[in-house]
Amino acid sequence: MNWAKMRLAPWLDTRAKFVAGVPRGGSLLDIGSSDGETLRHFFELRPDLRFHSTDLAGMPENYPTGCRFHRGDIEKDRLPWPDASMSAITCMHLVEHLNDLTLLLAEVSRLLMPGGRAYFETPHPKTVDLPRIRDKWEGAFTMNFFDDPTHTKPVPIAMLAEKARAAGLEPVRSGISRNLMFAASHLIYRFARPSRAKFTAQVHWIGWSAYLILRKPG
């Protein structure tokens, strides 16, 4: 789905609602950009923004045109951007892969402009109790938290908020991340054969991901 179609109704998707609120012409840093799918959606929604990204590996050839990419280890390396240079920072499904969040949160605090906001998203702790994906879909989709062998441990939002406060950030809002259209499609796909569309609808229906929005004081 091209997110340009969501410009009139970004509230249908938790991530889109956050990105839609970034000041016009601002700078957005995506930490943990992976294959760039989410970053491309952000660009479709907000082509006016200046995009930056960082990842341990990354696929910068897939990122939006003009996106400045840095390859690095966020548990060990400081990021190359200046202090207070970002209007917004997004971090999608990264914290559950890390052993130590100290440097990540310190860098988010350093890089945000005063009043800037950060959006974190991570699997809800309840995902440890969901059924495992089996058969031909094993390894192709994550339903149970441990379907992804690179996950370390769930990160409850309350714990993430506490660590963020220690880094000088203010929790603003938290909840369940959903795309309401995908969630509604579960009413149809629940009766269908296993497919990526069926699993995607299911995770949005059950509230697979939790989010936290943080603000830098000022």
Language model features: what each stretch is:
Residues 3-6, 37, 99-107, 117-217:
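S-adenosyl-L-methionine-dependent methyltransferase catalytic module, highlighting the catalytic core
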Residues 1-82, 88-92, 105, 174-177, ...:
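Conserved N-terminal segment of class I S-adenosyl-L-methionine
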